[in-house]
Structure formats: C-alpha cells, structure tokens
A protein has these predicted regions:
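FMN-binding flavodoxin-like domain, especially the glycine-rich phosphate-binding loop
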Residues: 1-112
C-alpha cells in the first residue's frame, strides 16, 4: 500500500513506477481526504509506503495532516518506508515525517 501526494506529477510518476515494481496498491492522498477515508488494514506481508515532494524542506501540510488522522491496522512486522522527491535537498523532511508517523505508532524504516 503506497500513499502519495503529487502536485506536478513528478512524485505520482515515481510512486506509480514503484507500485508496479513491487506490486503494491497506489492511493492518492487528496482523493482519500475527499472521501473521508483514513482507516486501512495491511494484509500479511504488505508494505506501507509514503511518497511526496519536499515542500520547504518538509513534507507538505496535506501529507502531515493526513497522517495525523490515519488509522492503520497492521501485522507486528509490517514494513514502512518513505520517499520524497526534491529539487536539491530534502532538508528535515524525513525527520518531520517520522515524528508524524510516531503519533500513530509507525516509523519509516527506510527513507529515500
């Protein structure tokens, strides 16, 4: 399961290629917010990914707000990862992301 946000399409392309390569479902964060969908269940062996552009050296507000409302039911060994696209420097985007994820009991084990 990959949650993504993209304004220009760059991150959408990256997230789509990763989803195809690893066989994961791709979910667009703005659509989920419009639908009021925040509860998800990870299947056994399913990974959880987040893809987003870096805005001002951090994840976009829409991503942070979505994570605060997110409710994930998962296996104890569920693997979480995150990828950010950026022009030159991701700043503290992943540190901020992991602080948000910690509020719902998750941590991105690998970040790109």
């Amino acid at each position: 399961m990959i949650f993504y946000f993209s304004r220009t399409g760059n991150t959408r392309w990256v997230a789509s290629e990763i989803a195809k390569a690893i066989g994961e479902e791709l979910l667009y964060i703005p659509d989920l917010i419009r639908q009021g969908q925040y509860a998800f269940t990870l299947k056994e062996g399913e990974r959880l990914g987040f893809c987003f552009p870096t805005h001002g050296w951090q994840p976009p507000r829409i991503v942070r707000d979505f994570i605060r409302r997110l409710c994930i039911t998962k296996a104890d060994d569920a693997y979480c990862w995150a990828l950010t696209t950026c022009g030159d420097n991701m700043g503290v985007a992943m540190t901020i992301l992991n602080k948000e994820l910690a509020t719902i009991g998750l941590k991105a084990e690998t970040t790109f």
